[in-house]
């Protein structure tokens, strides 16, 4: 059996040749999960905060902190928009979640989402040079239920520190209320990655695929396998792009969605 390359480029070669595709997929997933656990434990997560300004002598601490920083405070006080130029706010994204719908693992408790939220911040920094902060919120109310208003209030209070908000892994229907409310209430961009990000990519792929086969979006039949936040938003985007709702079918774990279902809340 071969040893893995540091780049993991030979991952498929680490397993027996007689593995079926299903066995290979399961083995790779198990391997990556165990490797992820070991690496996260070794590094203590995958994100750190590093200063980007130089310190050329001890007195430079008086520039970056007090008394020099007072000039920054009063300037921003007089014009809040200068906070985007005089602090890291313009390059800082809040990655916010209550961890109630973490990938395929469901409700992982608030802290259980940190791995994914740090992962999103990792991608932002590595691929785009944007600083992301993982913020996992306890959204339970006094009745022990997940309350979207808890997330909304938290983001509103934290807004002055960030240039944008990335909502992540919030279960439906709470995710819709959180997104719609914050987009109206905040003066910075608010983005729901699971819905809008996935929806944009899927719509782009569908448009290009239909161009290749020479078919019209309004005349094809479209099937959605799943009725979560991603697929419901994808459906809305596809309809806005010109798809015919009467030619679309959506399944959840029980079956197709239709008006005769009595197990779905209106």
Briefly describe each language-model feature range.
Residues 2-188:
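N-terminal ligand-binding/catalytic initiation module
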Residues 103, 111-128, 192, 200-266:
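Glycine-rich phosphate/diphosphate-binding loop of Rossmann-like nucleotide-binding domains
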Residues 139-141, 197, 255:
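Residue-level detector of flexible, active-site-proximal loop/helix-junction positions
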Residues 168, 173-174, 185-195, 216-220, ...:
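Conserved structured catalytic cores and adjacent interaction surfaces
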